[in-house]
Amino acid sequence: MGRAVGALAACLLLLSSTMIGSLSMNDVKTKAMPEEMDPKPSGARAYDNLANFVDGSYRQIDTDANKDRRAWIKSELELIGYEVEEQSFTTEECSDCMNIVATLPGKMEDSWVVIGAHHDAICYSPPPLIGQTYPTCRSQGAYDDATGVANLLELAETMIEWGHTPEHTWKFGFWDYEEWQGSSSSEGGGKGSLHFVENVPEGVDVATYINLDMFGLNWPLTPPNLPTCSEDYFTLYLFASPIEDWSYYTERGLELTDDMREDAVRLQAQLVEILHEQLGYPVEWVRVID
């Protein structure tokens, strides 16, 4: 469990430093951040968020459990100090869906940085019947996507504790109905984030969107022994992993290209240059981790 907390903490540290430091190259040239941003994000606090949010519930859309957990998100944000917007919407499959959105005002009120994670959950029957939902499912969605919700709450709290006014206005969005409801559904997923996008006021520029979905992994990652999971499925994880010894994966048949390695090296170098050398973040924050 400690390694899981460590992975969450490392991901969150990279996320917060990347987002704060890379939004405007003008900021990079004209204003240096302090060597250490105090307070720092807490991996332990993020893990507590995850455990408290999950609470043994199955958060499928249009259920009491879903409504209870989104109310919990709202209450947590209000305790932190945010004014919270409830974005209600309906679809063919959902009569009572709701996004929860918190705002951190910036110097530019019409230029937004949006960070999102979905609070709903779904599960399907295992292969070969993928896409079939079943009434006895009680998945808690701890990975998909309570990890995103937990870390987004931690980021929102850290930004308040930081005590500065960011250049951009920040929106922390907790989306409902992102998950596809299965092969019997009359519509696809992504409804919550779509509702948010369709209601962005005219004249507002969304400068950046970052999505936290299934956020945080331990290493090494062992591919599951499922007939539908080939080694190619893990290319994305490997592409940006911190490991230097790739033999675990190459010995298991995953083809790694020089382009993949070069991209990871290039990204690492850019992070070090911008976040550590120019903005002064601790070097341990600046790692390509996932």
Residue locations for each model-derived region?
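Acidic, glycine-rich loop-and-strand cores that form catalytic or ligand-binding grooves
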Residues: 244-288
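A non-catalytic alpha/beta surface segment that caps or lines the substrate-entry region
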Residues: 49-107, 278-290
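Extracytoplasmic/secreted proteins, especially bacterial periplasmic and envelope-associated proteins
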Residues: 45-52, 64-84, 147-154, 169, ...
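Glycine/charged-rich beta-loop-alpha catalytic/anionic-binding loops adjacent to active sites
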Residues: 111-113, 121-138
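Secretory targeting signatures
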Residues: 1-37, 175
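Acidic/histidine-rich catalytic neighborhood of metal-dependent amide-processing enzymes
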Residues: 136-257
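Structural recognition of the beta-strand scaffold that forms the well-ordered cores
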Residues: 49-52, 85-87, 100-103, 112-116, ...
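Extracellular/periplasmic catalytic domains that process cell-envelope and extracellular macromolecules
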Residues: 44-46, 93-96, 104-109, 163-168, ...
